[in-house]
Amino acid sequence: MRVKRRKTVSCCTREISQLHGQSLKQINIGVGSLILTKHQGYEFYCKKVTFVFFCFFKISLNSAYLYTLYSDVRTEVAKMERVAWLEVVGKFETEKLTPNSLYEVVFVVKLIDSAKGWDFRVNFKLVLPTGETKERRENVNLLERNKWVEIPAGEFMISPEHLSGKIEFSMLEVKSDQWKSGLIVKGVAIRPKN
């Protein structure tokens, strides 16, 4: 059993429409790669470790956490085995998006049958390049079990003058010290909202 305090992991991106067989353009960016199509929707998946982010992703889990790698059909994800404090934070450059289009940011998660300790609401936050913050709380304990569920962090529209900024998104539960287990985070999707 390994106990870790803080971890930075490198991840890669995969375009949503890749699953639908559209042709893709891939761009290498440091440790990851970015794949684009016309509608500019992005889905983020980790290469090897727990959670998800674009190129660098920070996970901070109070004093200790333990996770197990879990293979899904299309990507490797991780299941939380023992978590006290949850802090998942990511950033994304908005220059890759289409100006004046409405986008949504969603976390893709699954709660397994044996999940415990999710009695406190989890905070989902989105910070825009303008500094505007969108925040919502979700009781993940009420999610349907053993099914991938999308939890929205927020919606946004990028104006041409803020095109070269960043959005930040996070999933936090830092108010309780209750040990939690059984949550699998598959990824974060940033995609056009129809």
UniProtKB/Swiss-Prot annotation:
Record has Thylakoid as a keyword: no
Compartments (UniProt record): Membrane
Transmembrane segments: 49-71
Protein's recorded name: Protein PHLOEM PROTEIN 2-LIKE A2
Molecular functions (GO terms): carbohydrate binding
GO cellular component: membrane
Highest rank taxon of the organism: Eukaryota
Expression sites by tissue: Vascular tissues, specifically in phloem companion cell-sieve element complexes.
Chief localisation class: membrane
Lineage, highest ranks first: Eukaryota, Viridiplantae, Streptophyta, Embryophyta, Tracheophyta
Listed InterPro entries: PP2-like, PP2-like/Lectin
Presence of the UniProt keyword Membrane in the record: yes
